[in-house]
A protein has these predicted regions:
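Alpha-helical transmembrane segments and their immediate juxtamembrane cytosolic regions
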Residues: 1-205
Length: 205
């Protein structure tokens, strides 16, 4: 039986709690006591990013034995499992977009498809790809107008269900676009490929 990494479980718990708090704030509005607004602001942006990183770590741990042993058959099995999960999350997320436009699940599914492409890759390539996604985003903002499709008074996105609008929202200016958000999951994959039971590595990071 594999030894659980308690720190990851604790981090997941905090990330989930943080996402719940942030989503409640979005639904119920920003009015309330100043201390409550201050507490919720601590989680904004951080909880979702942390959860995506931890998802990448989880996918790494799921495939680490096969990866380090260069077991192509087991890596293929892991890729099939991840593909099924990615497709499920993508479709479920899209199914309630009209109810909850800020959904992260369909983005999550696309991040996982990118993970599949890099599941056999060396950690340096994984980290380099994450860095590319981060650095490319400001350049994209110089080329394409960020607010295309958005009405920031109502937070409605026009043309979402068109091919152009969907791709733009998914990769560039949605709530959690692939550029740069997929980098968080790739960093998690890179981190999970390291020896997380090595105390000296944990202290360095």
């Amino acid at each position: 039986m594999k030894q659980r990494i308690i720190g990851l479980d604790v981090a997941r718990a905090f990330a989930v709690i943080g996402m719940i708090i942030v989503n409640f704030k979005m639904v119920l509005g920003k009015q309330g006591a100043e201390w409550a607004q201050l507490v919720t602001s601590v989680f904004e942006g951080k909880a979702a990013a942390t959860f995506v990183v931890l998802a990448g770590v989880g996918l790494a741990l799921m495939s680490n034995t096969a990866f380090h042993n260069n077991d192509l058959q087991k890596l293929k099995q892991a890729m099939v499992r991840i593909t099924k999960r990615a497709l499920f999350l993508f479709l479920v997320g899209l199914s309630y977009m009209d109810i909850w436009p800020a959904d992260i699940l369909h983005f999550y599914g696309i991040y996982m498809f990118l993970i599949i492409l890099l599941l056999k890759a060396k950690p340096k390539l994984v980290f380099g790809t994450a860095l590319f996604l981060i650095l490319a985003y400001p350049l994209m903002m110089l080329i394409w107008q960020y607010d295309t499709g958005w009405d920031f008074e109502t937070f409605e996105y026009s043309g979402f269900w068109t091919l152009e609008g969907f791709v733009r929202n998914l990769f560039y200016n949605g709530y959690h676009p692939v550029f740069p958000w997929a980098a968080f999951m790739l960093v998690g994959l890179w981190f999970g490929r390291q020896d997380l039971h090595n105390a000296s590595f944990i202290k360095k990071t």
